[in-house]
């Protein structure tokens, strides 16, 4: 018996990487992170400490798959927090303590979730393999079958609220042709609440009321897709961006400016030039029809003003008074030894009000990840003029981002 237990323990240690588990525990202690394991998934946040405002609505969650079995939250959460504040992160686990290879990250708004899909889909991990990042379907409705004919909506709603959390409403369908089965559609406040209810309702009805019911996800299409199992891509065929040649770094043998180290740490990136060179990701895939709320795009109106330029570290900019945004960003990158920004722009759509919307990608060699965003402009007198305007607006957004997530200042 003892020999069998030792063999099982050795087998478990072979499955679980002790060094990776130690790194996870150290990361949790260092950052005061609390992870809660509930019914096959380990959860962070929902809400996280310091969260202000209501819980995010639909469209704010992304589905992450192709996660290696020994990659845990200490690698994944900082990576996805590099896009924006995470409201909730759920990593699916099996009984051995391994991950099941997929997780969910929920952001505060759909725009940030869209940026996560655009930026981190096909992101290559140092451990090997590429992450797959998609929009989560966020199913919230369960179908309860084989209910007794005497059941009514108000009674069922009261019972469900006692047995599960997050019940919003219940729609009871009349008995079928044989008059023996009643079906109910139950809406929950979140996919997590519905998923937890799905795990407990069958047994709860059997133990408390002696009733054997069926519980499954409501099918909205012919193809069955269950969200607590790895899901396939439901998006349209993506548009593959033209690959960029690997850029060379300016001052390659000199580390980046110290004020950028918080940015590298925030995104889980390296803090030396040699490591950053190894971490430059391949161009990602962008969907043609990713919808961005116009209210979010209009936030571009609050752009960084043209500010007087002040030399730093003994290096003087080309213009001692002021620069346009493109030149300004170029100057910031040169001063902080990040390399020259490279722009990639694609037309997105034309709005009824006449504005043209463009998606941009700015690759700065000294940063571990490209920067993505959307801009809107009015039609110009020439293609060259419009291109210059798009570059200017993109540069302004990038300057804002650099100033927000690091100690850099635009002057």
UniProtKB/Swiss-Prot annotation:
<dbReference type="GO" id="GO:0060965">
    <property type="term" value="P:negative regulation of miRNA-mediated gene silencing"/>
</dbReference>
<dbReference type="InterPro" id="IPR012677">
    <property type="entry name" value="Nucleotide-bd_a/b_plait_sf"/>
</dbReference>
<keyword id="KW-0539">Nucleus</keyword>
<feature type="domain" description="RRM">
    <location>
        <begin position="60"/>
        <end position="138"/>
    </location>
</feature>
<dbReference type="InterPro" id="IPR035979">
    <property type="entry name" value="RBD_domain_sf"/>
</dbReference>
<dbReference type="GO" id="GO:0003730">
    <property type="term" value="F:mRNA 3'-UTR binding"/>
</dbReference>
<dbReference type="Pfam" id="PF14709">
    <property type="entry name" value="DND1_DSRM"/>
</dbReference>
<dbReference type="GO" id="GO:0043186">
    <property type="term" value="C:P granule"/>
</dbReference>
<dbReference type="GO" id="GO:0005737">
    <property type="term" value="C:cytoplasm"/>
</dbReference>
<dbReference type="GO" id="GO:0005634">
    <property type="term" value="C:nucleus"/>
</dbReference>
<dbReference type="GO" id="GO:0003729">
    <property type="term" value="F:mRNA binding"/>
</dbReference>
<dbReference type="GO" id="GO:0048255">
    <property type="term" value="P:mRNA stabilization"/>
</dbReference>
<protein>
    <recommendedName>
        <fullName>Dead end protein 1</fullName>
    </recommendedName>
</protein>
<dbReference type="GO" id="GO:0060047">
    <property type="term" value="P:heart contraction"/>
</dbReference>
<dbReference type="GO" id="GO:0007281">
    <property type="term" value="P:germ cell development"/>
</dbReference>
<keyword id="KW-0963">Cytoplasm</keyword>
<dbReference type="GO" id="GO:2000145">
    <property type="term" value="P:regulation of cell motility"/>
</dbReference>
<dbReference type="InterPro" id="IPR000504">
    <property type="entry name" value="RRM_dom"/>
</dbReference>
<keyword id="KW-0217">Developmental protein</keyword>
<dbReference type="GO" id="GO:0003723">
    <property type="term" value="F:RNA binding"/>
</dbReference>
<dbReference type="InterPro" id="IPR044448">
    <property type="entry name" value="DND1_DSRM"/>
</dbReference>
<comment type="function">
    <text>RNA-binding factor that positively regulates gene expression by prohibiting miRNA-mediated gene suppression. Relieves miRNA repression in germline cells. Prohibits the function of several miRNAs by blocking the accessibility of target mRNAs. Sequence-specific RNA-binding factor that binds to U-rich regions (URRs) in the 3'untranslated region (3'-UTR) of several mRNAs. Does not bind to miRNAs. Germline-specific protein required for the primordial germ cell (PGC) survival and migration during early embryonic development.</text>
</comment>
<dbReference type="GO" id="GO:0008354">
    <property type="term" value="P:germ cell migration"/>
</dbReference>
<dbReference type="GO" id="GO:0010628">
    <property type="term" value="P:positive regulation of gene expression"/>
</dbReference>
<dbReference type="Pfam" id="PF00076">
    <property type="entry name" value="RRM_1"/>
</dbReference>
<dbReference type="GO" id="GO:0043073">
    <property type="term" value="C:germ cell nucleus"/>
</dbReference>
<keyword id="KW-0694">RNA-binding</keyword>
């Amino acid at each position: 018996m003892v020999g069998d237990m030792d063999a099982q323990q050795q087998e478990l240690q072979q499955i679980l990487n002790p060094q990776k588990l130690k790194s996870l525990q150290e990361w949790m202690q260092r950052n005061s992170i609390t992870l809660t394991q509930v019914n096959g998934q380990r959860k962070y946040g929902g809400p996280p400490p310091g969260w202000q405002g209501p819980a995010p609505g639909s469209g704010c969650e992304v589905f992450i798959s192709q996660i290696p079995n020994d990659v845990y939250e200490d690698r994944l959460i900082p990576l996805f927090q590099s896009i924006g504040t995470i409201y909730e992160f759920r990593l699916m686990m099996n009984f051995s303590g391994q991950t099941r290879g997929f997780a969910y990250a929920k952001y505060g708004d759909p725009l940030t979730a869209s940026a996560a899909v655009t930026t981190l889909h096909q992101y290559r991990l140092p451990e090997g393999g590429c992450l797959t990042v998609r929009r989560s379907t966020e199913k919230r409705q369960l179908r309860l079958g084989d209910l007794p004919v005497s059941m009514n909506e108000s009674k069922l709603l009261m019972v469900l609220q006692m047995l599960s959390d997050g019940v919003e409403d219940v729609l009871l369908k009349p008995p079928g042709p044989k008059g023996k089965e009643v079906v109910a559609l139950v809406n929950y406040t979140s996919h997590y609440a519905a998923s937890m209810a799905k795990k407990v309702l069958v047994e709860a009805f059997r133990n408390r009321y002696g009733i054997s019911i069926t519980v499954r996800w409501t099918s909205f299409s012919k193809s069955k897709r269950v969200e607590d199992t790895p899901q396939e891509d439901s998006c349209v065929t993506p548009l593959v961006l033209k690959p960029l040649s690997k850029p060379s770094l300016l001052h390659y043998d000199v580390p980046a400016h110290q004020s950028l180290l918080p940015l590298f740490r925030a995104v889980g990136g390296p803090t030396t030039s040699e490591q950053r060179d190894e971490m430059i990701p391949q161009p990602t895939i962008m969907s043609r029809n990713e919808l961005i709320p116009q209210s979010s795009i209009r936030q571009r109106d609050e752009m960084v003003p043209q500010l007087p330029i002040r030399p730093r570290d003994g290096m003087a900019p080309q213009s001692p008074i002021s620069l346009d945004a493109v030149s300004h960003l170029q100057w910031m990158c040169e001063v902080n030894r990040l390399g020259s920004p490279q722009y990639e722009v694609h037309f997105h759509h034309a709005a009824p009000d006449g504005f043209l919307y463009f998606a941009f990608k700015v690759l700065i060699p000294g940063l571990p990840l490209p920067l993505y965003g959307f801009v809107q402009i009015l039609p110009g007198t020439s293609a060259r003029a419009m291109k210059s305007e798009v570059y200017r607006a993109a540069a302004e957004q990038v300057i804002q981002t650099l100033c927000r997530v690091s100690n850099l200042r635009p002057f």
